[in-house]
C-alpha cells in the first residue's frame, strides 16, 4: 500500500509541476503504467490522485469527470497490456488526450444542456490537440523505461 500511496502522490506532484504547460501532463502516462503493472490494484494510486486533486483544488464538475475518465484510460491500457510497441502506447495516450473533451461531454451535457456541452467541447479543441501532442510525446519517450521501473518496484 505504501507504494500505491507514493505513486498517487507522485502523480499529483508531477501534474502540478507541469501545470504551467496547458493540457500537457504526465497523468495519462502514470494511469497507463499503473493499469498494466498493477491490474485491478491500479485503482489505489489513480483514485488517491483524484482525491488529492479534489482536496487541493476544491469541488467542481471536473471532479465527476475524473471519477470515470481515468478509469476509461486504465481499462483501455489494461486491455493493451501485452503491447510492446512504444508507438502503440503513444497512439493510445495521444488518442485519449484528443478525446478528453468528448469524455467530459456527458457531464457537461447533464450540467448545462446540449448548447453548453457542444460549445465547451468545440472551444476546448485547441487544448485537446495540445493534450494529444503532449501525451503522445511523453508516452513515446517514457512509457517503456517507466514500465520497466514500475514493474521492478512492484516486484519488490
Q: At which residue positions do the language-model features occur?
A:
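Membrane-helix interface segments
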Residues: 1, 40-45, 82-88, 117
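Interfacial aromatic-anchored transmembrane helix boundaries in multi-pass membrane proteins
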Residues: 12-25, 48-83, 112
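Hydrophobic transmembrane alpha-helices
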Residues: 1-33, 37, 41-45
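Structural signal for the C-terminal ends of transmembrane alpha-helices
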Residues: 36-39, 76-84, 144-151
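Residues within alpha-helical transmembrane segments of multi-pass membrane proteins, especially transporters
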Residues: 10-13, 17, 30-33, 37, ...
Amino acid at each position: 500500500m505504501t507504494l500505491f500511496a507514493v505513486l498517487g502522490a507522485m502523480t499529483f506532484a508531477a501534474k502540478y509541476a507541469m501545470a504551467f504547460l496547458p493540457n500537457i501532463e504526465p497523468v495519462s502516462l502514470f494511469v497507463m503504467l499503473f493499469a498494466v503493472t498493477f491490474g485491478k490494484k491500479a485503482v489505489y494510486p489513480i483514485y488517491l490522485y483524484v482525491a488529492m486533486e479534489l482536496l487541493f483544488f476544491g469541488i467542481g464538475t471536473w471532479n465527476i469527470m475524473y471519477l470515470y475518465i481515468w478509469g476509461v484510460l486504465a481499462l483501455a491500457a489494461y486491455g493493451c497490456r501485452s503491447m510492446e510497441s512504444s508507438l502503440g502506447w503513444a497512439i493510445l495516450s495521444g488518442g485519449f488526450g484528443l478525446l478528453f473533451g468528448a469524455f467530459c461531454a456527458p457531464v457537461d451535457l447533464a450540467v448545462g444542456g446540449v448548447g453548453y456541452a457542444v460549445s465547451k467541447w468545440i472551444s476546448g479543441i485547441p487544448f485537446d490537440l495540445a493534450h494529444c501532442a503532449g501525451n503522445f510525446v511523453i508516452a513515446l519517450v517514457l512509457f517503456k523505461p517507466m514500465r520497466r521501473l514500475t514493474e521492478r518496484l512492484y516486484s519488490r
